């Protein structure tokens, strides 16, 4: 009961904002001056949900089939390279100019090259999504390691903590707030590339679902797909935020 009361106290304003958005849409859909095709009535969207609810989950799995491998690949590369650069001033001097140059290139601009060079569209999509995830996480890892308080390192030296144990017991925990911040930023931007990839080259995925029914002019189904996609992406972001809070509970004070 206390959790429910606390939830209401924290999010009642958010709930009012969502209600405001809902009633704004209801007003638009009932207004004769608004295109009924683009803004179908709410009951029509609800009916569309019922008609294609099983298809939603197939498309969700298709999206995760692209997102999860991309995330794993990007994390491995970002953590490995970020750790090396964070620990080695020489590597930072040599690689920083190259990384800054490459990282400013939007992944969407690389899509023609990825489509031509990759053996299939799925690998091209995974490359583009992973490319988009790597940079914020990489820079956050580097900054997290080079800004570690010297006290932690001195204590590790005193306790003779070295090698892999030093990495996982001292460096990564101390740098984790920065790493998580970069990762969450990466994931937010990744949804844009994920939807772009699905809209213009796959036959499965949440972005593909919305694009397909938009092309057909069935905007009630497109709205249903868009709302479902927003709901799923919101759950993913909340899950990462919860994982972040749990991992960094020793640094977070929300009281």
Task: Annotate each language-model stretch with its function.
Residues 127, 131, 164-197, 240:
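Transmembrane alpha-helices
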Residues 182-231, 241:
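Non-cytoplasmic
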Residues 146, 181, 223-255:
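C-terminal transmembrane helix and the adjacent membrane-cytosol boundary/short C-terminal tail
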Residues 69-99:
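Transmembrane-helix boundary motif in ABC transporter permease subunits
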Residues 141-179:
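Short cytoplasmic-facing helical segments at TM-TM junctions of multi-pass membrane proteins
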Residues 1-19, 238-255:
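Transmembrane alpha-helical segments of polytopic membrane transport and secretion proteins
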Residues 6, 30-72:
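Periplasmic/extracellular loop-to-transmembrane helix junction in inner-membrane transport proteins
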Residues 100-136, 143-144:
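Generic hydrophobic transmembrane alpha-helix motif, especially the helices
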């Amino acid at each position: 009961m206390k959790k429910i009361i606390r939830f209401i106290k924290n999010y009642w304003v958010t709930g009012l904002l969502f209600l405001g958005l809902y009633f704004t849409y209801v007003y638009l859909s009932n207004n004769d001056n608004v295109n009924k095709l683009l803004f179908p009535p709410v009951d029509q969207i609800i009916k569309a949900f019922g008609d294609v609810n099983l298809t939603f989950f197939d498309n969700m799995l298709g999206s995760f089939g692209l997102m999860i491998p991309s995330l794993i690949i990007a994390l491995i590369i970002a953590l490995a390279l970020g750790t090396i650069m964070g620990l080695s001033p020489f590597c930072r001097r040599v690689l920083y100019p190259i990384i800054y140059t490459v990282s400013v290139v939007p992944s969407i601009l690389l899509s023609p090259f990825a489509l031509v060079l990759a053996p299939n569209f799925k690998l091209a999509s995974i490359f583009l999504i992973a490319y988009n995830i790597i940079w914020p996480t990489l820079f956050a890892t580097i900054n997290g390691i080079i800004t570690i308080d010297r006290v932690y390192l001195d204590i590790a030296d005193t306790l003779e903590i070295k090698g892999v144990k030093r990495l996982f017991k001292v460096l990564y925990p101390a740098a984790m707030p920065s790493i998580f911040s970069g990762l969450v930023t990466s994931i937010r931007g990744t949804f844009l590339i994920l939807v772009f990839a699905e809209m213009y080259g796959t036959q499965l995925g949440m972005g593909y679902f919305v694009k397909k029914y938009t092309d057909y002019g069935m905007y009630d189904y497109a709205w249903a797909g868009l709302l479902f996609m927003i709901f799923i992406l919101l759950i993913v972001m909340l899950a990462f935020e919860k994982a972040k809070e749990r991992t960094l509970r020793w640094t977070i004070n929300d009281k």
